[in-house]
Amino acid sequence: MKILLDSVYIHNGGGKVLLDMICEKISENGDIDNYFFLFDKRYQPISQILKNTNYKYVNSSESKRKEFYKTNSQKFKKFLCFGNVPPPILINKSVDVYFHNDLLIRPLLNNTSIINKIKLLLKKYYIISKNRKNYKWCVQTKIMSEKLSKFFKISRDKIHVYPIYVTNFLNINKKTDNSFLYVSNFAKHKNHRRLFDAFRQASNKIGHNITLNLTIDEREFKDSFYNKLTTNNNLTIVNHGISNKSKLNELYNKSKYLIFPSLNESFGLPLIEAVLSNCYIICSDKEYVYQIVRPSLTFDPNSIESISQSIVNAYKNIGLRKPKLLVENKIDTFVQHIQEYV
C-alpha cells in the first residue's frame, strides 16, 4: 500500500518551493513508487514526477478532495496533507499535516483586506474541525510549533519541527555593487508598498544608483505602483517574474543584499537562501527571522523611514555584519518520518 501525498491548494510561492524539494528528495531516494501524488490542478510538478503514473490532478476545492478520499482512502496506508488542511473525511490511519501558513494562525491581525481575513478565519476553524487526536502535525520552526499548539489547541507532542531548505546553491560570488533583491510574491503582507516608498526615499539620500530586483508575477508587476509611479534617476527597479531555481540562483549570486520587509512568515526561506549565497540580509525586526538566521541589519517593517535608513546604512556599510544560518536542514529526517511504519 502506498503513501498519499495530498498537496491540493499548493501551486505557487513558498509552498510550491517546499513541495518541489520534497518530491525531488523522494525521487533521489528511489522511493517514488511508494507514493501516490494528489496535485492541485494549477501545480506544475518536477519532471521526475511526470515520469511516474501515480498522480492525479484535482481542482482546488474541498468537495473534490472529499470525492477523491471517499473513493480512494482505503488504498493508502499513510497520508501526508501538504496544504495545511487535514483530510476532509475521518481517517483512522497514520496522518501527517504539514502546516506552513502563518496567516492562518491569527487571521484578524493580518495586514490584509476584511474579506481575506474572514476567508482565513473560516479556513482556520474548518482546519480545527477536521483535526483528530491521532493526527500528527509538522512545522518548520519552534515558534510555529508554539503558535499551532496555542491557537489551534493541538497537543505539543503531536507537533514535529522540520526545517526544510535547498543547500546546493551555487555561490560564484559575482556580486553587483548596490544591488538589492527581494524574493517574494505580491501578497499584501509582503509589504511591497512600504518597500517601494523606502527605496525612493533612500535613493534620494544616497545620490548614486541603486537597483532593486523583484520576482513578482509579470501581470501583477505591470498593474502595480512599481510600474505606474515614477522614481528618480538613482533608482532602477527590475522585475524578473516568477523565477525557477536556476534563475533564483543567478539572482542571489548577482545581488549584494537581500532585503526582506515581510510582516508575516511561517519560515522565510529566502533568508536561508541568501546566507547560502553570501548575501547580506537586511530584514524586518520580526521573531520569524531570528528563528532561522542572524541578519546583517534589521528595521521596523511598519516604518518607511526605518526601511529607508537601513538601505542607506547598508550602502554605507554602517553596522553591517555577515549573516549567520541558525537552523539545520531536516529534509532527510522529514522524509524518513513520513515513511515510518510503511
Features from the language model and the residues they span:
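Conserved acidic donor-binding segment of nucleotide-sugar-dependent glycosyltransferases
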Residues: L297-E305, Q309-I318
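Membrane-proximal helix-turn-helix segments that form the acceptor-binding/catalytic region
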Residues: N116-C138
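A charged, aromatic-enriched C-terminal amphipathic alpha-helix characteristic of glycosyltransferases
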Residues: N171, K316-V342
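A conserved mid-protein helix/loop that constitutes part of the nucleotide-sugar donor-binding site
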Residues: G13-E24, A187-Q201
